[in-house]
């Protein structure tokens, strides 16, 4: 084993140390959160070694030491894949998680079970690392299910609240639908290719691969909250803010997109699957951006923004640019985690107030949070030379110059423009104007745990895109030339969104309240999707099952088995007895005498 493989395994091993301490006195002490945070920061520093080695030499590796099990002709080994995706993703995820854990020490300090909370966060990170470094489908599935169950536990952390429990069950149920697709894809690979190792699957590269790829797209739709299976993501905001920052920025929600990126050698020659992925992503990115426009809960706006960015990543995979989608995953993690943490800072200081209509004027009382929120919003919209620009601008350029569906491209551009609108809306409502919160509210943002974590992520939101894009070797052929107007499209639509938001804000400040329009209702009620999908199918299945139960069980089976069958038997007996009355003399006369 060389330095490359040993540091990768050391990084994974170091993360498991605090979990092993569960039965010791450290776990019971109040130093445990600090211990977990230091462990994650150490793992981050260790993970930089293979990343630097990779950027200098381009070295990739598969660590396949442990033979696991042999089933007839299938050999399963515990193997780790240290390639472009896992080596780059690990430091990003660890850096973001380190900041989130430091933020959690401030945000969750009064929680009586804070040690268990930190253990859950760490377990969540470990399962994500298993998913990212897995080299066969079975190992990947362990990580896949791990992030699912940990998200259930973390979303339902405040289990005394009905909304939190409902949201946790909703998340797990929507993910079950995706898991069915994953299991079906695994079954297809096993029965047709007799292997779960990724190298062998890609080497065989079956020509008729529509079925397994459809299963993988269904899995990605469930995990990455694409249109149709998206309602769980805004509902998951019922969990604590650090959970929202960890799940919905860098880890769980990108797992679905990451799965499709892993399988890009199979998808790159399959035009049908690419078109499906692109159209699905385009619908998601526009629909969720529209939903974000009229929400009033600050966390829900950022959650819909996450879903919109995931749709953009799916579009990127659909135009055959998986490495670009991966770059967007890495850059997006920094500013999205920071946006969630800024909202957490505001919510915590305003005594758990999440409605942006009850905020305002926070730029005076919370200057640092204001700065980070504005930087994060600008990075999200793709303002030049911030982190988001380096991936988002490239995605729009690649989409503009690709020979693919112009409809998908057009609605992606509209969604990009809407990103600027809802980002501006948060800034106007929460930070500017007059304070609309109670005057007795005590606001202080002088805790180093909060400030240091936000500072680190703000540095990432400004510089990470530049560092990543200039140090990672290009894996796909970049676009050589394009007209200037195509080059400027992304910036133009973003500026259009900003202008539109400013214009609407200035014009509507003095207007009287009117009856809401149909488009406003559509956006506020999330396209009527939860209302229809969470009411009609359960109602139909419930009434159908009640009718079946009452007509088949009560009316037919239960009545026939006891009351009616007994009555029928007694009726026959009584009829027989009554028919025999007065016939004794006749029977005696029949008896022959000898």
Swiss-Prot record:
Known catalysed reaction(s)?
A: a ubiquinone + NADH + 5 H(+)(in) = a ubiquinol + NAD(+) + 4 H(+)(out)
Give GO terms: molecular function aspect only: NADH dehydrogenase (ubiquinone) activity
InterPro entries linked: NADH_DH_su5_C, NADHpl_OxRdtase_5_subgr, ND/Mrp_TM, NU5C-like, Proton_antipo_N
Q: Which GO terms describe its cellular component?
A: mitochondrial inner membrane
Record keywords, A-Z: Electron transport, Membrane, Mitochondrion, Mitochondrion inner membrane, NAD, Respiratory chain, Translocase, Transmembrane, Transmembrane helix, Transport, Ubiquinone
Membrane-protein topology: Multi-pass membrane protein
Q: Which Pfam families match?
A: NADH5_C (PF06455), Proton_antipo_M (PF00361), Proton_antipo_N (PF00662)
Please give the biological process terms from Gene Ontology that the record holds. Answer: electron transport coupled proton transport; mitochondrial electron transport, NADH to ubiquinone; mitochondrial respiratory chain complex I assembly
Where is the protein localized?
Mitochondrion inner membrane
> Per the UniProt record, which EC number(s) apply here?
7.1.1.2
**Which positions, given as ranges, span the membrane?**
1-21, 43-63, 87-107, 114-134, 137-157, 171-191, 211-233, 241-261, 272-292, 301-320, 325-347, 366-386, 409-429, 457-477, 486-506
Say yes or no: keyword rRNA-binding present.
no
Q: Specify the enzyme's EC class, one word.
A: translocase
Protein task: Core subunit of the mitochondrial membrane respiratory chain NADH dehydrogenase (Complex I) which catalyzes electron transfer from NADH through the respiratory chain, using ubiquinone as an electron acceptor. Essential for the catalytic activity and assembly of complex I.
The record's subunit annotation is: Core subunit of respiratory chain NADH dehydrogenase (Complex I) which is composed of 45 different subunits.
The Swiss-Prot or TrEMBL record describes its family as follows: Belongs to the complex I subunit 5 family.
The identity of this protein, by name, is NADH-ubiquinone oxidoreductase chain 5
Q: Which organism is it from?
A: Hippopotamus amphibius (Hippopotamus)
Lineage, top ranks: Eukaryota, Metazoa, Chordata, Craniata, Vertebrata
- Gene that this polypeptide is encoded by: MT-ND5
């Amino acid at each position: 084993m060389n330095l490359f493989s040993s540091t990768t395994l050391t990084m994974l091993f170091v993360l498991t140390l605090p979990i092993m301490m569960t039965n010791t006195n450290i776990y019971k002490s109040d130093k445990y959160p600090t211990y977990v945070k230091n462990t994650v920061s150490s793992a981050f520093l260790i993970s930089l070694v293979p990343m630097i080695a990779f950027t200098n030499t381009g070295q990739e590796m598969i660590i396949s030491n442990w033979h696991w099990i042999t089933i007839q002709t299938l050999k399963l080994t515990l193997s780790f894949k240290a390639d472009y995706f896992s080596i780059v993703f690990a430091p990003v995820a660890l850096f973001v998680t380190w900041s989130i854990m430091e933020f959690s020490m401030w945000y969750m300090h009064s929680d009586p079970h804070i040690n268990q909370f930190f253990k859950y966060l760490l377990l969540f990170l470990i399962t994500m690392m298993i998913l990212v470094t897995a080299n066969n489908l079975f190992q990947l599935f362990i990580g896949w299910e791990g992030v699912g169950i940990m998200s259930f536990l973390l979303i339902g952390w405040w289990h005394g609240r009905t909304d939190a429990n409902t949201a946790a069950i909703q998340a797990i149920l929507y993910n079950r639908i995706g898991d069915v697709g994953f299991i079906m894809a695994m079954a297809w690979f096993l029965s047709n290719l007799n292997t779960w190792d990724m190298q062998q699957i890609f080497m065989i590269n079956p020509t008729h691969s529509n079925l397994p790829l459809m299963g993988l797209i269904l899995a990605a739709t469930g995990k990455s909250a694409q249109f149709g299976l998206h309602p769980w993501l805004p509902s998951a905001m019922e969990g604590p803010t650090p959970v929202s920052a960890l799940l919905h920025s860098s880890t769980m929600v990108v797992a679905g997109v990451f799965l499709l990126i892993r399988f890009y050698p199979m998808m790159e020659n399959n035009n049908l699957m690419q078109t499906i992925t692109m159209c699905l992503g385009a619908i998601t990115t526009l629909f969720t951006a529209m939903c974000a426009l009229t929400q009033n809960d600050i966390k829900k706006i950022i959650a819909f923004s996450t879903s919109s960015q995931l749709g953009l990543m799916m579009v990127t995979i659909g135009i055959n640019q998986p490495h670009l989608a991966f770059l967007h995953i890495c850059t997006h993690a920094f500013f999205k985690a920071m946006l969630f943490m800024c909202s957490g800072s505001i919510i915590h200081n305003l005594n758990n107030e999440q409605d942006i209509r009850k905020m305002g004027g926070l730029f005076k009382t919370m200057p640092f949070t204001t700065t980070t929120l504005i930087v994060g919003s600008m990075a999200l919209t793709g303002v030049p030379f911030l982190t988001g620009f380096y991936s988002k601008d490239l995605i729009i350029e690649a989409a503009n110059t690709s020979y693919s569906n112009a409809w998908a491209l057009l609605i992606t551009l509209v969604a990009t423009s809407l990103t600027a609108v809802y980002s501006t809306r948060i800034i106007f409502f929460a930070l500017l104007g007059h304070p609309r919160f109670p005057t007795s509210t005590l606001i202080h943002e002088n805790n180093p745990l909060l400030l240091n974590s936000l500072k680190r992520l703000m540095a990432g939101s400004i510089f990470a895109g530049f560092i990543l894009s200039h140090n990672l070797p290009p894996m796909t052929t970049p676009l050589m030339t394009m007209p200037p107007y195509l080059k400027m499209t992304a910036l133009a639509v973003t500026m259009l969104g900003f202008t539109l938001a400013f214009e609407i804000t200035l014009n509507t400040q003095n207007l009287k309240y009117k009856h809401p329009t149909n488009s406003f209702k559509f956006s506020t009620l999330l396209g009527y999707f939860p209302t229809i999908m969470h009411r009609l199918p359960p109602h139909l299945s419930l009434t159908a099952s009640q009718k079946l139960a009452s007509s088949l069980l009560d009316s037919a089976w239960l009545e026939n088995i006891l009351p009616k069958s007994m009555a029928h038997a007694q009726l026959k007996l009584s009829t027989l007895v009554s028919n025999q009355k007065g016939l004794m003399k006749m029977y005696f006369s029949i008896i022959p005498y000898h």
